[in-house]
Design a protein with these regions (language model features):
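Short S/T/G/P-rich N-terminal loop/turn motif that feeds into the first structured element of a domain
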Residues: 1-187
Length: 187
């Protein structure tokens, strides 16, 4: 969105460990073809290795519990930066997530939706964790957010008691490459 905190959007690469990520980045920045690619596309994106964030990501629910995401890999995302309230921790967040899943179980809605938590290492001033919502579209996100405000009840109260979440980063998103589906790739 126009109000994004990040000049370059949100680019996400997922690795099985920080060591694997660091090794891949070191290889990438030394590769001549990669350097040429970055130079050719710097009007689209700039890869700032020094600003890379380290987050552990986890889905806390079956990602297809509301149906599959669109076949073309596109979706709409909301990334909420959240800070724990005084005396609260990841254990409290897990309790809130359990209530959130119960609330989701009671919804009668159609359309793809998934969410996940990006847990930090405590070094990010903006967030202890990021709550990521992955919707089929911006329209379905608006409906979901309205449902949350109107009927979130105990789950909403628990989450708000656990953490303060700021306004979200909003993106029209897409999968470029998924190693679980190697034949699927954006060109």
């Amino acid at each position: 969105s126009e109000e994004s905190r990040f000049d370059n959007g949100w680019w996400e690469l997922q690795w099985s460990s920080k060591e694997d990520a660091d090794a891949a980045w070191a290889e990438w920045i030394q590769d001549e073809e990669a350097s040429a690619f970055m130079a050719d596309h710097e009007s689209v994106m700039v890869c700032d290795g020094d600003a890379r964030g380290v987050w552990d990501f986890a889905f806390h629910r079956d990602v297809e519990s509301f149906g599959p995401m669109p076949e073309d890999g596109s979706f709409f995302t909301e990334f909420f930066p959240c800070k724990y309230n005084d005396g609260k921790s990841s254990a409290d967040l897990i309790e809130s997530i359990a209530l959130y899943n119960e609330w989701l179980d009671g919804l009668d809605v159609a359309g793809a939706y998934a969410y996940g938590i990006y847990s930090g290492d405590g070094s990010d001033e903006l967030a202890d964790f990021w709550w990521g919502n992955f919707h089929e579209s911006s329209e379905s996100a608006a409906v979901g957010n309205e449902n949350w405000i109107e009927s979130g009840g105990q789950a909403r109260a628990s989450l708000e008691a656990t953490a303060a979440c700021d306004v979200p980063e909003l993106y029209n998103s897409g999968v470029i490459y998924d190693p679980a589906r190697p034949a699927f790739a954006k060109s």
